[in-house]
Amino acid sequence: MNINKLSVVIITYNEEKNIARCINSVKQIADEIIVVDSHSIDKTKEIAIRLGAKVIEHSFEGHIQQKNFALQQANYSWVLSLDADEALSEKLKNKIQEIKNNPTADGYTMNRLTYYCGRWIKHTGWYPDKKLRLVRKELAQ
Protein backbone atom coordinates (compact mmCIF):
# COMPACT_ATOMS: atom_id res chain seq x y z
CA MET A 1 0.00 0.00 0.00
CA ASN A 2 1.26 3.47 -0.85
CA ILE A 3 0.34 6.33 1.49
CA ASN A 4 0.72 8.87 -1.32
CA LYS A 5 -0.96 11.74 0.54
CA LEU A 6 0.00 13.04 3.96
CA SER A 7 -1.76 15.60 6.14
CA VAL A 8 0.31 17.47 8.71
CA VAL A 9 -1.62 18.95 11.63
CA ILE A 10 -0.12 21.45 14.06
CA ILE A 11 -1.75 22.85 17.18
CA THR A 12 -0.87 26.40 18.20
CA TYR A 13 -1.38 29.24 20.62
CA ASN A 14 0.82 32.34 20.34
CA GLU A 15 3.57 30.49 18.48
CA GLU A 16 4.80 33.25 16.16
CA LYS A 17 8.40 32.49 17.19
CA ASN A 18 8.13 28.80 16.26
CA ILE A 19 5.48 28.25 13.58
CA ALA A 20 7.59 29.16 10.52
CA ARG A 21 10.33 26.71 11.48
CA CYS A 22 7.76 23.96 12.05
CA ILE A 23 5.87 24.53 8.79
CA ASN A 24 9.03 24.91 6.72
CA SER A 25 10.34 21.62 8.10
CA VAL A 26 7.35 19.67 6.71
CA LYS A 27 6.66 21.44 3.41
CA GLN A 28 8.51 18.95 1.21
CA ILE A 29 6.66 15.90 2.60
CA ALA A 30 3.19 17.32 3.36
CA ASP A 31 0.32 17.29 0.90
CA GLU A 32 -1.62 19.58 3.23
CA ILE A 33 -0.71 21.51 6.36
CA ILE A 34 -3.45 22.35 8.82
CA VAL A 35 -2.87 24.62 11.80
CA VAL A 36 -5.46 24.44 14.57
CA ASP A 37 -5.05 27.65 16.50
CA SER A 38 -6.50 28.42 19.95
CA HIS A 39 -7.26 32.09 19.18
CA SER A 40 -3.69 33.39 19.23
CA ILE A 41 -3.27 37.12 19.81
CA ASP A 42 0.14 37.30 18.13
CA LYS A 43 1.00 36.75 14.44
CA THR A 44 0.82 32.94 14.47
CA LYS A 45 -2.17 32.74 12.12
CA GLU A 46 -0.79 35.29 9.64
CA ILE A 47 2.56 33.51 9.44
CA ALA A 48 0.92 30.10 8.96
CA ILE A 49 -1.34 31.41 6.19
CA ARG A 50 1.57 33.15 4.47
CA LEU A 51 3.45 29.83 4.45
CA GLY A 52 0.53 28.01 2.83
CA ALA A 53 -1.15 26.36 5.80
CA LYS A 54 -4.89 26.18 6.27
CA VAL A 55 -5.72 27.76 9.65
CA ILE A 56 -8.73 26.69 11.70
CA GLU A 57 -9.52 28.44 14.96
CA HIS A 58 -10.75 26.21 17.75
CA SER A 59 -11.02 27.01 21.45
CA PHE A 60 -8.61 25.02 23.59
CA GLU A 61 -10.38 22.36 25.66
CA GLY A 62 -7.28 20.36 26.59
CA HIS A 63 -4.19 19.03 24.83
CA ILE A 64 -5.63 15.65 23.84
CA GLN A 65 -8.94 17.18 22.76
CA GLN A 66 -7.11 19.71 20.58
CA LYS A 67 -4.94 16.99 19.02
CA ASN A 68 -8.04 14.89 18.27
CA PHE A 69 -9.86 17.88 16.78
CA ALA A 70 -6.84 18.57 14.56
CA LEU A 71 -6.74 14.93 13.47
CA GLN A 72 -10.38 15.14 12.37
CA GLN A 73 -9.63 18.15 10.15
CA ALA A 74 -7.16 16.16 8.05
CA ASN A 75 -8.30 15.24 4.54
CA TYR A 76 -5.92 12.32 4.02
CA SER A 77 -5.80 8.98 5.79
CA TRP A 78 -2.19 9.41 6.98
CA VAL A 79 -1.57 12.20 9.47
CA LEU A 80 1.58 13.59 11.04
CA SER A 81 0.76 15.48 14.25
CA LEU A 82 3.19 18.10 15.56
CA ASP A 83 3.38 20.85 18.12
CA ALA A 84 4.46 24.25 16.81
CA ASP A 85 7.81 24.16 18.61
CA GLU A 86 8.80 20.93 16.85
CA ALA A 87 10.59 20.57 13.52
CA LEU A 88 11.67 17.58 11.46
CA SER A 89 15.30 16.81 10.73
CA GLU A 90 16.37 15.94 7.18
CA LYS A 91 16.91 12.34 8.30
CA LEU A 92 13.37 12.13 9.68
CA LYS A 93 11.87 13.73 6.55
CA ASN A 94 13.65 11.12 4.42
CA LYS A 95 12.34 8.32 6.63
CA ILE A 96 8.77 9.65 6.44
CA GLN A 97 9.08 9.82 2.65
CA GLU A 98 10.16 6.15 2.65
CA ILE A 99 7.16 5.29 4.82
CA LYS A 100 4.85 7.20 2.47
CA ASN A 101 6.06 4.98 -0.36
CA ASN A 102 5.88 1.71 1.56
CA PRO A 103 4.17 1.73 4.98
CA THR A 104 4.62 -1.41 7.08
CA ALA A 105 2.57 -0.37 10.14
CA ASP A 106 -0.49 1.68 11.06
CA GLY A 107 1.43 4.13 13.23
CA TYR A 108 4.99 5.26 13.83
CA THR A 109 6.72 6.68 16.88
CA MET A 110 9.44 9.29 16.72
CA ASN A 111 12.13 10.17 19.22
CA ARG A 112 11.60 13.70 20.42
CA LEU A 113 14.71 15.62 21.41
CA THR A 114 14.13 17.89 24.38
CA TYR A 115 16.23 21.03 24.72
CA TYR A 116 16.64 23.11 27.85
CA CYS A 117 18.64 26.35 27.87
CA GLY A 118 19.88 25.48 24.40
CA ARG A 119 21.22 22.05 25.35
CA TRP A 120 19.85 18.65 24.41
CA ILE A 121 18.84 16.66 27.49
CA LYS A 122 20.10 13.12 26.83
CA HIS A 123 19.73 11.67 30.32
CA THR A 124 17.33 11.29 33.26
CA GLY A 125 14.64 9.60 31.19
CA TRP A 126 14.26 12.48 28.73
CA TYR A 127 15.69 10.48 25.83
CA PRO A 128 14.51 8.53 24.09
CA ASP A 129 11.18 10.32 24.41
CA LYS A 130 9.13 8.30 21.93
CA LYS A 131 5.89 9.85 20.72
CA LEU A 132 3.30 8.38 18.35
CA ARG A 133 3.11 11.06 15.67
CA LEU A 134 2.48 9.45 12.26
CA VAL A 135 -0.79 7.50 12.16
CA ARG A 136 -3.54 6.20 9.95
CA LYS A 137 -6.38 8.58 10.74
CA GLU A 138 -9.14 6.00 10.80
CA LEU A 139 -7.31 3.96 13.45
CA ALA A 140 -6.30 6.86 15.72
CA GLN A 141 -8.14 8.82 18.46
Language-model features: locations:
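N-proximal low-complexity "stem/linker" segments adjacent to membrane-targeting elements
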Residues: M1-S25
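Acidic helix N-cap motif at the loop->helix transition within catalytic regions
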Residues: A20, D42-L51, K91-L92
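Short, acidic, metal-binding catalytic loop of nucleotide-sugar glycosyltransferases
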Residues: N24-I33
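A conserved acidic beta->alpha catalytic loop
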Residues: S25, D37-E46, D83
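Conserved donor nucleotide-binding strand/loop of the catalytic core
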Residues: D31, K45-Q73
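Catalytic metal- and UDP-sugar-binding loop of GT-A-like glycosyltransferases, i.e.
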Residues: V36, H58, L80-A84
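Catalytic-site signature of metal-activated, phosphate-bearing donor transferases
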Residues: N68-Q72, Y76-L82, S89-Q141
